[in-house]
């Protein structure tokens, strides 16, 4: 089953009839318009390309304008692709709404996490700090040793060090679908999702549901 592209509106909470508070993230899922259908014969795989939202005319490049015009859809804020499963069929120009998730219980949400800039190992990797006193004067938050000896004589790939934190693609799996509001194009999922308010999200039926 394909997914949909939405926009993170923010977080709130809703109450059950028993008075239990559920923290939810509100995702606005405007109609996803199909701009291209890829098939085995021409592309080597089956998929659909979709767009959503709107883009100012002066921000649309000529190649983009031609692509959207050929599909007969309004220019959107980006292009995303979803692989098609056996038996799934879509046509160019078709509109897909949030009702796609009407019978879905859990979803996986992918977004770009908030960037935190250059961060040290304590913040980035939860390293323990070294002694505050006991003769330690300069190495309270340094990572410590990063290798061994003349053998192997190098720092291994993947060593946890200071560096850019956040601003990367993150997927949160198996979030409960609390409500699907087709009238207002809203999807409410339990818990937090990656990214800042207003950022794009890819919502798919959960792999591990």
From Swiss-Prot:
The modification N5-methylglutamine is found at residue 150. The keyword RNA-binding applies. GO terms for molecular function: rRNA binding; structural constituent of ribosome. Pfam families: Ribosomal_L3 (PF00297). Transmembrane segments: none annotated. The modification N6-succinyllysine is found at residue 38. InterPro entries: Ribosomal_uL3, Ribosomal_uL3_bac/org-type, Ribosomal_uL3_CS, Transl_B-barrel_sf. Gene3D superfamilies: 3.30.160.810, Translation factors (2.40.30.10). It comes from the Bacteria. Keywords: Methylation, Ribonucleoprotein, Ribosomal protein, RNA-binding, rRNA-binding. One of its GO terms (cellular component) is cytosolic large ribosomal subunit. Methylated by PrmB. One of its GO terms (biological process) is ribosomal large subunit assembly. The keyword Mitochondrion does not apply. NCBIfam families: L3_bact. Part of the 50S ribosomal subunit. Forms a cluster with proteins L14 and L19. In pull-down experiments interacts with CedA. One of two assembly initiator proteins, it binds directly near the 3'-end of the 23S rRNA, where it nucleates assembly of the 50S subunit. PANTHER family: 50S RIBOSOMAL PROTEIN L3 (PTHR11229), LARGE RIBOSOMAL SUBUNIT PROTEIN UL3C (PTHR11229:SF16). Belongs to the universal ribosomal protein uL3 family. This is Large ribosomal subunit protein uL3. It comes from Escherichia coli (strain K12). The lineage of its organism: Bacteria, Pseudomonadati, Pseudomonadota, Gammaproteobacteria, Enterobacterales.
């Amino acid at each position: 089953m394909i997914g949909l592209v939405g926009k993170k509106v923010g977080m709130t909470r809703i109450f059950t009839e028993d008075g239990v508070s559920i923290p939810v993230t509100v995702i606005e899922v405007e109609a996803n318009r199909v701009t291209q259908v890829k098939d085995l014969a021409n592309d080597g795989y089956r998929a659909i390309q979709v767009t959503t939202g709107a883009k100012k005319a002066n921000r649309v490049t000529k190649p983009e304008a031609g692509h959207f015009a050929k599909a007969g859809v309004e220019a959107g804020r980006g292009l995303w692709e979803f692989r098609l499963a056996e038996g799934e069929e879509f046509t160019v120009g078709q509109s897909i709404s949030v009702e796609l998730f009407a019978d879905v219980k859990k979803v996986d949400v992918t977004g770009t996490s908030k960037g935190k800039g250059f961060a040290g190992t304590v913040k980035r990797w939860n390293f323990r700090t070294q002694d505050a006193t006991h003769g330690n004067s300069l190495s309270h938050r340094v990572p410590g040793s990063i290798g061994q000896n003349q053998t192997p004589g190098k720092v291994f790939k993947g060593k946890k060090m200071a560096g850019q934190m956040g601003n990367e693609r993150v997927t949160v799996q198996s979030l409960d679908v609390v409500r699907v509001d087709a009238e207002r194009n809203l999807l409410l999922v339990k818990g937090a999702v990656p990214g800042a308010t207003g950022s794009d999200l890819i919502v798919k039926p959960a792999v591990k549901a």
